[in-house]
Amino acid sequence: MIHERIKEITNRIKERSKATRQAYVEQSKYNFENSTGRRGLSCGNLAHGFAACSHDEKGVIAEGVQPNVGIITAYNDMLSAHKPYERYPDEMRGYAKEMNATVQVAGATPAMCDGVTQGQPGMDLSLFSRDIIALSAGIGLSHDMFDGVMNFGICDKIVPGLMIGNLGFGHYHSIFIPGGPMPTGISNDEKAEIRQAFAEGKIGREELLKGESDSYHSPGTCTFYGTANSNQMLMEIMGMQLPGSSFVNPDTEMRRALNREAMRVLLENIRNKSFDRTIGQIIDEKAIVNGVIGLLATGGSTNHTLHLIAIAKAAGIQITWDDFSQLSDVIPLICRVYPNGAADVNHFHASGGMAYVMKTLLDRGLLHEDVNTIVGHGLRKFTEEPKLIDGEVVYKTGPEKSLNDSILRSAENPFLKTGGLRVLKGNLGTSVIKTSAVLEQNHIVEAPAVVFDDQDDVM
């Protein structure tokens, strides 16, 4: 039974969004039932669409019987998190061929790394890039060559942009494919000590660069719980990513098996022609509320107080910061992952990870269980963990309790009784603060306010 306050907030969002959501669903349903796809293309259109394909692929795509999957990729090899995507299109083509389907890269999007641009002029483009990514995804999908969508993207603005772009095609079956975090490097405490030593002039730039490089050291997502890893949590808790797939390291047998399973699931959804498993039906009011709850319970990135509002709007749903704040009153903080703890996401995954997060929240009535996902109706499936048996992914019962209470706790015994984000209002404006990363003695600060004209003045 869902918590009464969560039910009340969800119902209020539904009422507020009634007209816009209804229009969105009606348009998605019309497109789902009436889209002719490749059958509606002229011979000239179709010839252009598969000109670069092999002879066999041309015949299959032209026939229109087997699914043709469009990939939207945010690959570049500057972003460590996106480097694994370099080989994914060919890998997915192989899996699709085994399963009597074809794959084409429908389009590519920009992918910025805030870690590279922070403190630099390029950072001014970061938030704008989200909407460019959404447009880029939409352009790729507008060719009408595809029966479903596979998305390759992880980092800060990329996943929100891909979600917004995909939701513009709400009649499609879509799936998100994570790349996984890099293995753990030096500890976050050690990294902080190195930075402090540099700030105090005790070590030089060479030693600082070595410390940073020992932390960010290989392909995969950075291991702290920032926006990139919050994206992965959101995609899983909102039902757009395979259960247990978010935090599996790159270039492992399990990662490859999960990629193959993702292709199988997507093709199954396409062939079953289930409207309930299209992205526009998976991302409904309950899924959006679940995303906010996941963010609060895990102490995720404050950037999602912007992104979730935009994602929801793309699906005809209207949410506000007040919804975040009111949900925070009833959602406990159950994770301590850097920057609101010493552990990284690999430690979090080993402690029970997303399977346990969803289990303990569901058991306490703090998540909507009755939702559509890429693997069917109901979120309880996401409390299971993937195991590798004879090279195949098999789902088994997930952990019944946390394996490390200093990193992950039950909803009955949380780190904090209220969530990790708070909305602040005052005569200077409205803001959001990540309370999970603030020591309790600093929850109230009395000091003169300093007002700057622009961000450069702060520096």
Q: Which residues are covered by each model-predicted region?
A:
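N-terminal small/polar loop signature for handling phosphorylated ligands or for N-terminal nucleophile
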Residues: A106-D144
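Catalytic or ion-coupling anion/metal-binding cores of large enzyme and transporter domains
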Residues: M1-D77, A81, D90-T109, Q120-G122, ...
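A short, small-residue-rich loop immediately preceding and capping a beta-strand
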Residues: G140-L162, H173-P178
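Acidic/charged coordination and interface sites in well-structured regions
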Residues: R87
